[in-house]
Amino acid sequence: MEIKLFGKWDSETVAVKDPSLKSYISVAPVLVPHTAGRNSKKSFDKSKMNIVERLANKLMANQNNTGKKHETLAIVEEALTIIENRTKENPVQVLVDALENSGPREETTRISYGGIAFLQSVDVSPSRRLDTAFRNIALGASESAHKNKKTVAQCLADELIFASKADMQKSFAVKKKEEKERVAQSAR
C-alpha cells in the first residue's frame, strides 16, 4: 500500500535541489502529518519532522491559532489542494521549492569590539535557513489574509506559489530573504 500525504499527494517523487538542505528537509511519506511532539525531545530532531507538519506548527504561532493543530492542518491541506489545481504540479514539490527560495543564505550578527558595536556578515546554518523560511511564509500568509476577503488557505497557497517561483514582488518570504542578504552584503 502506498502512503500519500492526506491520502492525495505522493512525496516519494519530491526532489530537494539544494544540497545543503537535503538532510534537513524531511518528505518521508506520512498519512497525517501529526507527530504529537515526538521530535521535540532532542535538539535537531525537528529535521526528521515532515515539512508539512512544520509549516502547520508555524501557522499555529500567532495568538488566534495557538494549539489548534487540526484547524491548521485543514488550512494547509486546503492550500495544497489550491496549489495543485492552479499549478498542476505536486504541491509538496512546490512547498520544497518555496523553502529553498525563501531561506536566507547569509545574515548579520552584532559584534561589540572595544565598546563599539557593528554588524558582521555571517553564513546561516541550513536549520536556521529553514526555520526562517517557515516563519516568513507563515507570517506572509497570515498578514495578507488580515482584513482581506481571501481565506488564510488561499493566501498561503499564493505565498507558496510565488515563493516557489522566487517572485520578489509578490512573495513576502522572498522579499524578506533578499532584504536580509542585502543588509549582510553591505556589512561585509
Curated annotation (Swiss-Prot):
The keyword Transcription does not apply. Keywords: Ribonucleoprotein, Ribosomal protein, RNA-binding, rRNA-binding. PROSITE patterns: RIBOSOMAL_S7 (PS00052). One of its GO terms (molecular function) is rRNA binding. It comes from the Archaea. The keyword Ribosomal protein applies. One of the primary rRNA binding proteins, it binds directly to 16S rRNA where it nucleates assembly of the head domain of the 30S subunit. Is located at the subunit interface close to the decoding center. This is Small ribosomal subunit protein uS7. The lineage of its organism: Archaea, Methanobacteriati, Methanobacteriota, Methanomada group, Methanococci.
